[in-house]
């Protein structure tokens, strides 16, 4: 969006101009909106000046700047074609507006116009009143899955080219969100499933996200049914992964295809998936399930004296062991890595599970002694009591007697428990086809999985860009709402990348949100309506830097006056 000044009837005004693609005409069309007078603020009596509100500048302006660098509105409009209300906002304008709302002031879409009115920076030159929830939901029913996937690939290509993101290692993971449903319209996305929030009264929508190695920037996502499998969603993304692979090469200006690696956890293990990833051009790095035969072999190797060795550099506090073995029909490098944080978490989990199991085992012991439990029922309930947290490996049970009069004894074997902690707990088995990578590089790449987990924390309830609470009842609305949320996450991540700050995303957005214009109404002594003037705040060093980087002064030129050095007193 371009901001300039124009004289009208002897008065100068600041004008915002925007170019939007019109699919019907097959060309771009121009829009303009008046931002306000360009004249300097009037001289006024402070005793008669009153504040009448504030307007957002920093957070909205920063995300609008990032969206303009990627040409998000144009990218979406070109992919989706002539989608949008007649004379109203296009699909690109609606989605970008909702994405910025989710990141700056999460709320219902019926409050979208109010949110846009509360900001000095503008997403569109159209009046805020045309950005309604009804317009969003109508557009959502016209956009297809394929169009959203094409838009994701185009946006990822633009992000890599503009912000020079590292994409040699990409991390993939899934989560789910619960949503309210009150409609008789059949849908495929919101299903009964195991919600991460532990709520059973709501339906679940799944989300799989592919994240860049640097910046926590989501490059590709997929919405899927809440009762779907993790492997299924990754397999459904294979075509998108292939297109993304080619688009990233173009964005980085490579003459030869890059060697990219896809990182994921053990829930995505599948021999067939390993082969399919190789076909679409990706190397693989995965944390094998510990019950896998190759993982068992690697753990036995790592349990030998002197097998676990400390790594160098930033990973000098990490110990790992390495071997090469056949995993199914393919040759892979296995790395057993030790994590004290994981070990402590598993020990806490075992302590809680063991306490519950002891209560159940004592109850079974009493029922058996009273002759109120058959052997088959006893065996089944003992198996259920010891099913979690490796309890069956160190809680020794003995069931004897007859089918109708069984006997039951149990004990906790401290030696077996110590052996479990020494050889299995706190350890992951990493499996990769990157045979030439060093052990440190493999461990560092797998730690990139944290990028996805951090992104999910930002999208959960109470997070920076929350997905819910959601009342998007139809599948189309759920898809486009999720797209806007992921886009909001990407805008925040890119804004943090541009500033290069060490602070986390939440303090960064809070600092940007502190750049607000205070509206004051004053009396000049002349005739006519009392003028309303925007006053700039006192800025910190970080906020002054953000004003320059994100060009916030184009929306609020008076911000520059806050950045001038104070005169020295003689």
What are these model-predicted stretches?
Residues 1-93:
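Conserved glycine(s) in the ABC-transporter nucleotide-binding domain "signature"
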Residues 3, 11-14, 28, 77-570:
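Anion-binding and metal-coordination hotspots
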């Amino acid at each position: 969006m371009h901001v300039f000044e124009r004289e009208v009837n002897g008065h100068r005004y600041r004008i915002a101009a925007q170019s939007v693609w019109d699919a019907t005409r097959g060309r771009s069309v121009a829009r303009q909106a008046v931002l306000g007078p360009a004249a300097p603020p009037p001289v006024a009596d402070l005793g008669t000046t009153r504040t009448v509100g504030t307007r957002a500048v920093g957070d909205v302006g920063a995300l609008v700047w990032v969206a303009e660098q990627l040409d998000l509105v144009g990218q979406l409009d070109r992919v989706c074609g002539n989608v949008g209300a007649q004379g109203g906002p296009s699909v690109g304008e609606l989605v970008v507006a909702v994405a910025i709302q989710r990141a700056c002031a999460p709320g219902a879409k019926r409050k979208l116009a109010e949110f846009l009115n509360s900001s000095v920076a503008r997403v569109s030159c159209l009046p805020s009143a045309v950005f309604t929830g009804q317009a969003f939901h109508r557009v959502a029913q016209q956009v297809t899955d394929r169009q959203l996937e094409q838009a994701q690939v185009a946006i990822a290509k633009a992000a890599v080219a503009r912000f020079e993101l590292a994409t040699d290692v990409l991390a993939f993971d899934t989560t789910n969100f619960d949503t309210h449903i009150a409609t008789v319209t059949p849908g495929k996305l919101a299903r009964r499933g195991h919600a991460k929030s532990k709520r059973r009264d709501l339906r679940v929508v799944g989300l799989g996200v592919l994240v860049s190695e640097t910046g926590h920037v989501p490059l590709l996502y997929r919405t899927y049914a809440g009762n779907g499998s993790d492997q299924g969603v990754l397999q459904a993304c294979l075509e998108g992964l292939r297109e993304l692979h080619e688009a990233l090469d173009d964005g980085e200006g490579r003459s030869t295809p890059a060697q990219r690696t896809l990182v994921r956890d053990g829930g995505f293990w599948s021999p067939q998936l390993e082969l399919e990833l190789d076909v679409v051009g990706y190397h693989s790095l995965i944390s094998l399930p510990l019950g896998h035969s190759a993982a068992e072999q690697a753990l036995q190797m790592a349990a030998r004296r002197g097998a676990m060795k400390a790594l160098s550099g930033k990973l000098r506090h990490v110990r790992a062991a390495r071997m090469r073995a056949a995993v199914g029909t393919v040759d892979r490098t296995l790395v057993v890595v030790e994590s004290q944080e994981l070990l402590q978490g598993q020990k806490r989990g075992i302590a809680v599970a063991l306490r519950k199991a002891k209560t159940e085992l004592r109850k079974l012991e009493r029922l058996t002694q009273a002759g109120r439990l058959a052997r088959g029922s006893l065996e089944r309930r003992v198996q259920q009591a010891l099913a979690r947290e490796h309890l069956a490996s160190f809680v020794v049970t003995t069931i004897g007697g007859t089918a109708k009069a069984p006997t039951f004894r149990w004990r906790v074997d401290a030696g077996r428990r110590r052996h479990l902690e020494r050889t299995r707990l706190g350890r992951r088995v990493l499996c990769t086809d990157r045979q030439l990578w060093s052990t440190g590089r493999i461990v560092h790449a797998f730690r990139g999985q944290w990028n996805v987990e951090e992104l999910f924390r930002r999208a959960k309830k109470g997070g920076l860009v929350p997905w819910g609470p959601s009342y998007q009842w139809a599948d189309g609305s759920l898809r486009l709402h999720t797209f806007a949320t992921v886009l909001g996450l990407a805008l925040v991540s890119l804004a943090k990348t541009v500033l290069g700050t060490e602070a986390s995303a939440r303090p960064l957005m809070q600092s940007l949100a502190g750049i607000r214009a205070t509206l004051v109404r004053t009396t000049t002594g002349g005739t006519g309506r009392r003028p309303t003037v925007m006053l700039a705040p006192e800025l910190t060093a970080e906020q002054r830097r953000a004003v320059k980087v994100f060009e916030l002064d184009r929306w609020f030129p008076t911000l520059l006056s806050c950045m001038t050095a104070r005169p020295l007193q003689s």
